[in-house]
Amino acid sequence: GIQNKRVCIWLKNNQMSTPQIAFHKVFEPCIYGIRGDPFLSKYHTAFNEVMNKEVGTGNRLHGDVLDMFSVWLEKRLPASEMEHPTQKPPTLYEKAIRRCTKPGDSVLELFGGSGSTLIAAEQLKRTCYLVELDPLFSSLIIKRYEKLTGQKATKLS
């Protein structure tokens, strides 16, 4: 089976404040699980080595260091670009996919939503198996995938 390993937190920007609410939810949890022996990118397992390098804003190393923690900072999509009420940027999923899989590995997403996990997996050369129960959102996922790749999506029953 799949083992629950950790809950990661996505801190979102661009929150709309509501005066009647004392504490606003500015995060979303992400459950990370594994099946079998986990793969961790060797680049990301050399934590002390990475932390001892020059870490500054505006370079890839800065992002790589932040990707090692269970709190993720990633910008939300502007509302004008969202096709799904809770659409996430594919770059949010790239963090976990890049760190915990290698090209050719499979990724399982049980809440397909807008297909951002599928897009991230495709861009990183992983196979993604996605489940989405809502036919409207299933169609959205297929549309986004086919637009990105120029290929016909494969639906499994």
What residue spans do the PLM features occupy?
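Core catalytic lobe of class I
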Residues: 1-131, 135-138
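Short alpha-helix adjacent to the SAM-binding motif of class I
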Residues: 136-147, 151
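SAM-dependent methyltransferase catalytic region
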Residues: 152-157
